[in-house]
């Protein structure tokens, strides 16, 4: 097999999905590709570069619409698409936390979100901060969603008893996500 950046990313994703980010090392990646670790550096600079490539691959799952007139609809769309893409890869939220948003597709997505935030009424001065807020909401929600999916019915019942039975642990993650997004967007509408 020819070693290309695409082959490296595919092997890295295989390791991530099988063993998690803790086991994604240059050594395990080289072993997965049947090469020596030093050979990886002919294609990628370092682990940071690898994280950037993986994050770029994940964001390629997001197809931006040609045009969305309603900025709230555009922001909801991009948040939902980002969540969907993140849920496909194990430890994706950690990859994004460790990567830098400088790749082509990530830049397009960021520009799309910044434009929608500006049209939504957020001042240009605050658009990047609002974009970070939206990004962090999606990343933290997905991390929590993945963790909560492994909650057994017994654990959920125990949590409800600790909190008070009137507070139900809602396992409809899309409903939870949309509620939180609605709260976030309403706040942005109030404080521009």
Q: Which residues are covered by each model-predicted region?
A:
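Short, basic, alpha-helical segments at the C-terminal edge of helix-turn-helix-like DNA-binding modules
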Residues: 56-61
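Short, hydrophobic secondary-structure boundary micro-motifs
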Residues: 25, 94-96, 150-151
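Hydrophobic alpha-helical connector segments
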Residues: 64-98, 102-108, 131-134
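Hydrophobic alpha-helical bundle segments that form small-molecule/ligand-binding pockets
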Residues: 107-155, 188-191
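C-terminal peripheral helix-coil segments that are non-catalytic and often amphipathic
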Residues: 119, 147-192
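Helix-turn-helix
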Residues: 7, 11, 15-49, 53
């Amino acid at each position: 097999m020819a070693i290309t950046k695409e082959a490296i990313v595919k092997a890295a994703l295989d390791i991530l999905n099988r063993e998690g980010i803790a086991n994604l090392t240059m050594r395990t990646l080289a072993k997965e590709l049947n090469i020596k670790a030093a050979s990886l550096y002919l294609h990628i600079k370092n682990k940071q570069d690898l994280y950037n490539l993986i994050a770029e691959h994940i964001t390629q799952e997001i197809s931006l619409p040609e045009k969305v007139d309603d900025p709230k609809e555009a922001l909801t769309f991009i948040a939902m698409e980002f969540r969907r893409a993140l849920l496909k890869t194990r430890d994706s939220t950690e990859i994004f936390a460790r990567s830098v948003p400088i790749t082509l597709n990530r830049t397009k997505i960021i520009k799309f979100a910044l434009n929608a935030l500006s049209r939504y009424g957020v001042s240009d001065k605050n658009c990047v901060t609002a974009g970070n807020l939206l990004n962090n909401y999606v990343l933290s929600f997905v991390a929590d969603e993945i963790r909560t999916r492994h909650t057994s019915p017994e654990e959920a019942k125990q949590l409800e008893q600790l909190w008070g039975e009137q507070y139900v642990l809602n396992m409809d993650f899309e409903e939870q996500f949309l509620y939180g997004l609605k709260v976030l967007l309403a706040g942005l509408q109030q404080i521009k």
